[in-house]
């Protein structure tokens, strides 16, 4: 019997995640929490369910596994059988057995690991597959979880987004208009905030297409099925370096005028002047809103996060004097008001043609 196992991320409420999985695991006969993992049994399509859970926030990793007996001989044979099928020539494999506290067995994990590894080493000698000394040194992990009544030998392991359960911290409003804002939204979502509403500002058609692709990627990353988009054309009343801050300022004004009281800003001390960050935070608080800046204290980490998210991050520190921006105060307010008047609200289902649906709707 094949089952799907979801392993919660480090700070995820396991019971809440089990309930969340139960809601999405349609066609699954049983979803139960077993110590530090969630077992989904008798799924209509285990591959599809595993794929779905691998995009779910709050899940650290997902496995498709064979449900077998906890009997020492039977379990060892099951691990060897799975290993023989999934270990490729030349790979270094590591057999890892996790015995849950509720399990009732008369052996320790090392006993099973040693027995299965030894048998596999002999069986796979002809293809030069060798056991690794540690999990870190291995190119192939064979994981087995021993529960209260059954053991589960993992056939396939997949990483998942991690973070907290989507929406567990309430709703926020954010915009996606460049790589930094994309990372900001993604970080907020992984922290458990519900980013169902996304402001999509754009200066021209080219920028609209770029930003729409980022919105599509965001939806795919967090496994969303439906997204509300507020498409807003904007005009930046300047060129050059100062336009970067002006654009951010106009967008911040737009966000403050929207209904949601929690706003996510893509501000970071690595790029934006401190005085600029302080001004936006102060204005947001004065407007009765709560500002969030997930990237505020990040610098070198931004590049790594962008690579993990699958985007390019081409940013550098913006050096603009405070007085230079002050002269655009009236223009910023005027452009923000004008942009809001031309807002187009889109309610679209996420699918393979999502990008084109966004462009065509605007």
Predicted features by range, described:
Residues 1-25, 30-50, 127-134, 138-362:
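Nucleotide-activated chemistry modules centered on ATP-dependent adenylation/adenylyltransferase
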Residues 9-102:
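Non-catalytic nucleic-acid substrate-recognition regions in nucleic-acid-modifying enzymes
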Residues 67-165:
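Non-catalytic substrate-recognition/targeting regions of SAM-dependent transferases
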């Amino acid at each position: 019997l094949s089952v799907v196992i979801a392993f919660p991320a480090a700070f995820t409420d396991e019971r809440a995640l089990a309930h969340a999985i139960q809601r999405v695991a349609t066609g699954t006969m049983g979803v139960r929490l077993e110590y530090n993992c969630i077992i989904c049994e008798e799924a209509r399509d285990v591959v599809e369910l595993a794929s779905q859970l691998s995009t779910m926030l709050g899940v650290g990793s997902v496995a498709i596994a064979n449900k077998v007996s906890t009997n020492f001989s039977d379990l060892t044979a099951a691990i060897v059988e799975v290993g023989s099928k999934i270990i490729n020539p030349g790979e270094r494999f590591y057999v890892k057995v996790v015995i849950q506290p509720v399990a009732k067995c008369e052996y320790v994990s090392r006993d099973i690991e040693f027995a299965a590894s030894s048998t596999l080493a002999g069986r796979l000698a002809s293809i030069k597959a060798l056991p690794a000394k540690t999990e870190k040194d291995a190119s192939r992990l064979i994981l087995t979880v021993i529960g209260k009544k059954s053991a589960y030998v993992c056939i396939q392991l997949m990483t998942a987004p991690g973070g907290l359960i989507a929406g567990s911290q309430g709703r926020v409003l954010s915009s996606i208009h460049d790589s930094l804002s994309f990372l900001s939204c993604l970080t907020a979502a992984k922290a458990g905030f519900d980013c169902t509403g996304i402001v999509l500002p754009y200066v021209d058609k080219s920028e609209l297409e770029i930003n729409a692709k980022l919105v599509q990627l965001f939806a795919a990353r967090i496994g969303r099925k439906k997204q509300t988009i507020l498409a807003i054309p904007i005009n930046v009343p300047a060129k050059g370096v100062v336009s970067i801050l002006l654009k951010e300022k106009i967008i911040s004004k737009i966000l403050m005028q929207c209904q949601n009281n929690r706003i996510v800003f893509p501000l970071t001390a690595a790029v934006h002047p401190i005085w600029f960050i302080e001004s936006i935070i102060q204005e947001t608080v004065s407007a009765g809103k709560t500002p969030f800046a997930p990237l505020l204290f990040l610098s070198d980490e931004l590049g790594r996060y962008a690579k993990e998210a699958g985007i390019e991050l081409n940013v550098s520190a913006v050096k603009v004097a405070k007085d230079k921006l002050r002269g655009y105060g009236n223009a910023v307010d005027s452009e923000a008001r004008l942009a809001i008047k031309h807002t187009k609200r889109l309610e679209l289902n996420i699918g393979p043609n999502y990008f084109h649906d966004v462009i065509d709707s605007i």
